[in-house]
Amino acid sequence: MIFLLLLLVVPVSLAAVESPVSTLKIHYYRYGDDYQTGWNIWLWPLAGAGGQVDFDKNENVLVKDDWGVVATVDLTEAKFTNISQIGIIFRRGAWAEKDIDFDRFIQIPETVEGGTLHVYFVEGDEKMGYSTTDPNGPDRSDKIKSAFFTKANEIAYRLTASLAASDLSLYEDGTLLSTTITATNNTGKIVLAKDMDFSKKYQLKAQFSSGLKTYDVTFDGIYDSEAFEQAFGYDGNDLGAIVNNSSTNFRLWAPISSSVTLNIYDTGTPASLGGSDTKASTYTMIKDVKGTWKYSSNQNLHGKYYTYTITNGARTFETIDPYAKSAGVNGIRGMIVDFAQTNPDGFTYNHRPDNIVNATDAIIYELHVRDLTAHSSWNGPAEHRGKFLGLIDEGTTYEDVTTGFDHIKELGITHVQLLPFFDFGVVDESKLNDPKYQANGIFNWGYMPLNFNVPEGSYSSNPYDGTKRVTELKQVTDAFTKNDIGLIMDVVYNHTGLSADSNFNLIIPGYFHRLTPTGAFSNGSGTGNETASERYMVRKFMVDSTVFWATEYNISGFRFDLMALHDVETMNAIVTALKAIDENILIYGEPWNGGSTPLSPSIAADKVNLEDMPNVGAFNDEIRDGIKGSVFTAAEGGFVQGGTLPKIINRTKYGIVGGVAFPGLDLTDISYQTAWHTAPTKTINYVSAHDNNTLYDKLKLSTTYAQKQYIDEMQKQANAIVLTSQGVPFLHAGVEFMRSKPAVSGGYDHNSYESPDSVNQLRWDLKAEEINMSVFNYYKGLIALRKAHPAFRMATAQEVIDNVDFVYEDKQGIIAYTISNYANNDTWGTILVIHNNGNFLQLKLPEGEEGWNLVANGTKIGEETIKTYLGGGIISVLEHETLILYQGYKPLPTKRGCFGGTSIIPLAILGLGVLVLKKRKH
């Protein structure tokens, strides 16, 4: 009998043995039982791609247990094998709302009882539990969900359960206040007998049946008030760590914090990454004016690393300074920088290329740091591949064809716009030498900002040493300047890479971001949050940051990502600050956003309000889609594919005249049916950029079988239109030799933001192919021609209206125009540009006593005349060909002379024409 009992016991004991984790059970509790309103889970393996996980259902009915709903995850799937952490976010719909805004990670042990790991979550609670009785787990009892001032004497609150007004009480620095409370179900408002005092702490207490709960009242609802700005709007220029010869001064804006401690480290590397968490010293900071905290050291602390430990209410946390100017690995700790000790030899402040008078003189080339040098055919030093220093290596070739920096110089552009090179935090800088990570994970466009004023560590030779990234980036700007190329910075102030756990939000919750009426992060960026540029200290940060980059690194321009999420006043403030440094600094951006936003349309820095920003340019999606077709429909063609619809023609013409209100131009198909750019200096004309398909891939996807033989001609014509248009031309790196982005899974990659180098790299071996070299030489000639002839670079709407005329408008498939009157002091009297998108045809040239000199056709372009035609003569135009002719010639003076405030100096630009340069003010 005893033996039989033992047999019965054995299976039970065996079942309790731990086994490898194969299943994850996620238990989730919501107070309102509103799971059916679209709640789901976003789950991802650490450093891997995420995906939606739905809660379990049985015959379309949600499965519930004693805790709440349940989601089952199979951890034997390939993406979850051999991982130690899984990221988790509870969300409603496709990011309509998030429960807990920051990322949390489930720790996956190697084994667990029964092979199934259970994890428990509660709405609004940051904690997670690994059992229902886990002492470190979440609390399911009722609580206060939110309480914040909406006026100086009024608080709005939300509870998990209904309470009577008598169950609520408000305290000011521990003293009970006299209030009037109006309760409606689980929400209500509290009216104070007097206005609140920003220097005091307010706490709401609620007596639930499960016990007394407290909540620190926040200022979220009055951040936009004049009273808050007057109390805490700091206008000093000393935020961050400022190093002098024998001292270092720290100042942090943290107006609601009760204490701030400065932590000094000898290393920027935490123990988790092989460094140390031992603090060399800590200092209690002193609360000072306008919500700032300060500490002064009598030492030059250059090379040390620092963080702040901040207490807000019941929460204490350590974070990096938003004003940090360099950092250790992965941007976790800021670095104290004495820039006098990091400048490369010969570096000179306020030294930029003096290569433009007006924005229309610029030719912008958009490039990613890694793309230039990632492929083996670059043939530069291996240690510089994908790094800042690789951008400026000279003498690199592939089969006698220039690569890298020499290619850029040979092309002849005036400015390079680099995709984000601030510290974007997505790339794990501790894994840069891991071959697996190099193959899949090391690449990112960089649009998820971590530290706005810190150069990206993965682009430096040593991300563990914060001085390297500073010195090496300055070497880049210095080398560019010496080669007469301005460096434009792609800036992403419209959102932060992290939301609730970003350093901005940890320091002052809810201030730097716009929130929805429910208190969630608004998502106008499409990345989880958006910043509130209209607030005083956010605006100040943006101005301070751009001024810092312009002055410390000699940046020549700024491209604003999703600029419509910013407000007009902030953009104009940035312009004022930057133009005071150098009047030729370029400022432009994307006049759209990435989702719905609470920002008032009346103040958004978008197309409608561009007229209120006289020195801010904007990308011209009208000409982009007119030339090649919509970026949102791969198969849709535009002008170069043979399109003749009025909207195609008119959108292309709109770009040709530089986005101005040109007489006779039909604006029906232009945004808001208006010439919204207002001036050619504000019109960034382009056909392709890092977003969407490359031009070559778009042409492959949008042409018929019969048309594919003309793709190289279309590739040339697309930017022949851009480079002969009024406005500011913008080229995507590699477009000049038919760059493609072949997707890993086949086809073409239209969104390669985290695709591997194999997708994004510039293939110099392909440039060397004959057909691609012919396209490259054509682009090089176009650029030289534009630089030599100011008629293509008029700066005002009136100049364009006075000198440009469209011709051959009765000819289908033709867009043609003349630029007359020796426009903008050109040497050519009248220039005729003809774009033919269809079949071979013949045209009668305009009459005139002087002949027409053909200088560009589908294969040749330059200053030398290919053929001369009589006025009124017949000219043949091939399929998908652009012709450029001129009539009349007037040489410019060969001696320096003053003409309208400019110096006219003949220059040999690849053997072409002259360039009009303005003397820099000293």
Residues covered by each model-derived region:
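C-terminal beta-strand-rich structural cap/linker in extracellular carbohydrate-active enzymes
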Residues: H302-K304, K867-P893
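Conserved alpha/beta catalytic core and glycan-binding cleft of carbohydrate-active enzymes
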Residues: G334-Q341, V575-T576, A580, N584-M738, ...
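Substrate-binding/active-site clefts of carbohydrate-active enzymes
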Residues: R370-Y553, H566-D582, L586, P598
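A cross-kingdom C-terminal cell-surface attachment/processing module
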Residues: S903-K919
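The feature marks proteins involved in alpha-glucan
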Residues: A16-D34, V63-W67, A71-K151, T187, ...
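Carbohydrate-binding surface patches
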Residues: I242-S258, D805-P846
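Short, surface-exposed alpha-helix to beta-strand junction/turn motifs within ectodomains of secreted
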Residues: T37-A47, T160-T179, S258-A280
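Glycan-recognition and catalytic regions of carbohydrate-active enzymes
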Residues: T668, G727, L731-V744, Q761, ...
